[in-house]
């Protein structure tokens, strides 16, 4: 499940290194983040943003407000359970880091390249394994994949307008990928890739193959 957090209020309880990573990820999603925790680590303090509020103190039940999402990232199991309980009472999705039984959702390890996002989850069984797999994916799916996704997206409206029917469009997209779009981009660049896409769109619009 993907949640659109653009402009939404999120709460992170905890101010350590793990909390800093969670805050950074939320800010990258466009969320407005409030952090509550004692002794914020430097990595957290360096995350300067108009969308970030840091309250350097202990968590209080009164900190629970109208949030779209809550993350508990403290090393205090009592605080984490309180965060989980108070979030559930209010119907707010909550993730307690590395404690799936106290969470209503699990945050996967995510590999991002532009608009490409690949999520890896072990169901909370082994976050370390999920991170290792994500690192392997980072080596395989580099920036050229982001270029390809952006180029496909740039021609999506043209495909929707020119080619009638979901099946014909799906077949056309498959044909573009099968024709080696990624290889064309690597060897000849974006203009050649765009030309390949347009050829397939024209052929699909005319009911022909390439």
Where are the language model's segments positioned?
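Hydrophobic beta-strand scaffold residues
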Residues: 33, 54, 93-94
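ADP-ribose/adenylate-binding Rossmann-like module
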Residues: 69-75, 80-107
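E1/E1-like adenylate-forming module used to activate ubiquitin-like modifiers
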Residues: 96-146
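Short loop/edge segments at beta-strand edges and connector loops
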Residues: 37, 54-58, 98
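Residue-level detector of alpha-helix initiation sites
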Residues: 17-18, 78, 124
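An accessory alpha-helical subdomain
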Residues: 124-210
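Glycine-rich, highly charged phosphate/nucleotide-binding loops
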Residues: 48-65
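Hydrophobic, well-ordered beta-alpha structural blocks that scaffold small-molecule cofactor pockets
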Residues: 1-39, 44-47
């Amino acid at each position: 499940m993907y949640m659109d957090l653009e402009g939404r209020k999120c709460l992170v309880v905890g101010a350590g290194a793990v909390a800093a990573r969670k805050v950074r990820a939320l800010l990258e999603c466009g969320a407005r983040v409030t952090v509550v925790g004692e002794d914020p680590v430097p990595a957290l303090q360096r995350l300067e943003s108009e969308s970030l509020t840091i309250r350097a103190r202990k968590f209080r039940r009164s900190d629970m407000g109208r949030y779209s999402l809550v993350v508990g990232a403290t090393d205090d199991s009592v605080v984490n359970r309180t965060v989980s309980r108070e979030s559930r009472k209010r119907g707010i999705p909550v993730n307690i880091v590395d404690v799936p039984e106290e969470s209503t959702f699990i945050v996967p390890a995510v590999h991002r390249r532009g608009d490409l996002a690949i999520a890896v989850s072990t169901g909370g069984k082994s976050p370390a394994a999920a991170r290792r797999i994500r690192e392997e994916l980072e080596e395989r799916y580099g920036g050229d994949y982001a270029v390809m996704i952006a180029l496909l997206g740039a021609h999506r409206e043209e495909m929707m307008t020119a080619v009638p029917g979901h099946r014909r469009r799906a077949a056309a997209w498959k044909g573009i990928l099968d024709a080696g779009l990624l290889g064309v981009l690597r060897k000849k660049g974006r203009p050649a890739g765009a030309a390949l896409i347009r050829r397939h769109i024209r052929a699909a619009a005319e009911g022909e193959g390439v």
